[in-house]
């Protein structure tokens, strides 16, 4: 059934849950200097995991809903209409810029049920590698350390194209309901 947080209702072509699509990445100012110093002292390599979840009856919105309190549709101040759910957020971008400047090696893991825009891998200096791990499950999570240590070769063929900019796809314009906040892809 349709609710405030799930327009269109569960199973609807135009349904999703605002809570489910909300991004909870802290801002760089939220990390203490002590935490950042300890992490840098621990390793020359930073591993950053970018995650998104969407799919049947929980489509990806064309805006980003940020961390806030309450349920249902977030206040306007918590909606970033300049970025889609499948792009990195401003908070993730700041984190990636920080680790790109600070660490000798930076590995980005994409833990997403959908194809994300990966153009940031070319535009943010210092990002060395990117591995799409999809939704790992228990077997996939066990394989990641072997891949990172070089014991397992993750080569394979992708069935999807990972675009620099999803809006350049001809299908992007013709999906969803047609307004800026509930047009899904």
Show where each model-derived region lies.
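C-terminal non-catalytic regions of proteins with extracellular/luminal or membrane-system context
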Residues: 1-185
């Amino acid at each position: 059934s349709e609710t405030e947080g799930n327009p269109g209702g569960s199973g609807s072509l135009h349904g999703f849950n605002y809570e489910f699509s909300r991004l909870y990445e802290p801002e760089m100012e939220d990390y203490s200097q002590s935490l950042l110093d300890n992490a840098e002292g621990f390793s020359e390599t930073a591993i950053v995991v970018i995650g998104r979840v969407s799919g049947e009856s929980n489509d990806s919105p064309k805006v980003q809903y940020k961390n806030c309190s309450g349920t249902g549709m977030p206040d306007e101040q918590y909606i970033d209409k300049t970025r889609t759910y499948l792009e990195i957020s401003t908070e993730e971008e700041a984190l990636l810029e920080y680790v790109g400047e600070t660490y000798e090696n930076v590995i980005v893991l994409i833990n997403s049920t959908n194809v994300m825009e990966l153009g940031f891998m070319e535009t943010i200096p210092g990002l060395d590698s990117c591995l799409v791990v999809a939704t790992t499950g228990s077997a996939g999570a066990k394989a990641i350390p072997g891949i990172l240590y070089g014991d397992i070769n993750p080569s394979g063929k992708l069935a999807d194209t990972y675009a620099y900019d999803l809006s350049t796809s001809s299908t992007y314009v013709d999906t969803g309901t047609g307004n800026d906040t509930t047009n899904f892809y």
